A protein has these predicted regions:
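A broadly tuned preference for mixed-charge, low-complexity surface segments
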Residues: 66, 94-98, 114, 154-162, ...
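A structural motif corresponding to the C-terminal lobe/cap of the Radical SAM core domain
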Residues: 120-123, 133, 148-175
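A C-terminal junction/extension of Radical SAM enzymes
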Residues: 165-191
Length: 191
């Protein structure tokens, strides 16, 4: 009753939901039988068979993109984005609505060059794809610093993230809109 009254739903997120596709499908099917809206959030770094299996039973896929440039992606995430982009390209051919989520991280992916590369990539991948629902830009925060400190560990991103500056989220948003790409800049923070 709560979900019908609130208009809410359930989002499966991570870790990485695509690492447990059979369980995720069962949960999603049960929720949908109850009339509850479902979404999955994924980084897309999973076998296509898992992405396809889970995505086809969800009402919405929230797909994380961090960087367009593969070399930078490997540097900052430890993995190539080739699989992620191939999965996204295939996902956009399914009938499931897809929203791209981009954490805007100062000094990592908010330069004019990287913003333009990301938006060009998105334009090319999503052209003519009716499943594409737009972009959610998520400003980065450093809340994790405190958690690492409590554990007596160094925060791995402390040497990477540009300190003392706001991200260029508003610039990213304006460039996306100028290119005709539906985008929002979240007031919620990620990190």
């Amino acid at each position: 009753a709560y979900y019908q009254l609130s208009g809410g739903g359930v989002t499966l997120s991570g870790g990485e939901v695509m690492l447990q596709p059979d369980f995720a499908v069962q949960v999603l099917q049960n929720l949908r039988r109850e009339g509850i809206h479902t979404a999955v959030e994924t980084a897309g770094f999973a076998p296509w068979s898992a992405v396809e299996k889970v995505s086809t039973v969800a009402d919405l896929v929230l797909y994380d993109l961090k960087l367009a440039d593969d070399t930078l992606h490997q540097r900052f995430t430890g993995v190539s984005n080739i699989r992620i982009l191939r999965n996204l390209e295939k996902l956009l051919t399914l009938n499931t609505p897809v929203r791209l989520r981009i954490p805007v991280i100062p000094g990592v992916n908010d330069s004019s060059h990287e913003i333009n590369n990301m938006l060009l990539l998105i334009s090319n991948l999503t052209a003519g794809k009716t499943s594409f629902q737009g972009i959610d830009l998520l400003p980065y925060h450093a809340y994790g610093v405190q958690k690492y400190s409590l554990l007596g560990r160094d925060y791995p991103a402390s040497t990477i993230i540009r300190k003392g500056t706001e991200s260029n989220g508003a610039t990213f948003l304006q460039i996306a809109k100028d290119r005709g790409i539906s985008a929002t800049l979240s007031t919620s923070l990620v990190g």
